[in-house]
């Protein structure tokens, strides 16, 4: 067991890179299972990626990272996982990431792109770094329960290029409207014109 605030560095032979991890409260190294458990403000960094969460499990045998929130003394959920990949930051409830394939799976996530907020049920990070989103909401309202949103079935984020969504319907104050679109396109570049581009 490693005390809080210690940082360990381990070489992932399959990836030939360095994984750095730390935690504020406790680090437990299960040598037999080749697993490391990180408790309290846990952090993992590797090759341009960073994951922080209340609890993180490193499975060195399976080349996987698992992360989720933790409960505080009042039984409230705190320290939700935050996945940062280059300029993209995603907050979620739970995530799994494979350090070998670079694929990831996230549950109950939120993504902010300029003035747009995505609140989705699930997402998959592909090997090419695209993020595929399934079932959720798109809005420019920053409230937890937005005054209005577009209900989405799916969307794809291509880093530094674009965001494309499938069919979506407008909801206002929790009530669906007859307004809908077959798809939408959002530029996602450092130098871009802000705003949704709708089909003609």
Model-derived segments and spans:
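Structural signature for solvent-exposed beta-strand/loop edge elements and short helix-capping sites
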Residues: 2-200
């Amino acid at each position: 067991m490693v005390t809080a605030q210690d940082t360990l560095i381990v070489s992932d032979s399959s990836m030939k890179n360095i994984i750095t991890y730390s935690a504020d409260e406790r680090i437990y190294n299960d040598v037999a299972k080749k697993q490391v458990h990180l408790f309290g403000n846990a952090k993992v960094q590797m090759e341009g990626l960073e994951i922080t969460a209340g609890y993180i499990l490193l499975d060195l045998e399976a080349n996987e990272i698992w992360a989720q929130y933790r409960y505080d003394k009042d039984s409230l959920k705190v320290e939700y996982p935050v996945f940062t990949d280059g300029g993209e930051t995603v907050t979620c409830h739970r995530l799994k990431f494979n350090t070998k394939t670079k694929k990831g799976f996230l549950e109950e996530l939120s993504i902010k792109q300029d003035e747009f907020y995505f609140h989705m049920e699930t997402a998959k990070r592909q090997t090419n770094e695209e993020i595929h989103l399934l079932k959720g909401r798109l809005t420019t309202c920053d409230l937890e329960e937005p005054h209005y949103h577009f209900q989405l079935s799916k969307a794809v984020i291509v880093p530094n290029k674009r965001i494309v969504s499938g069919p979506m319907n407008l909801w206002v104050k929790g009530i669906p409207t007859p307004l809908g679109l077959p798809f939408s396109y959002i530029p996602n570049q450092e130098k871009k014109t802000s705003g949704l581009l709708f089909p003609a």
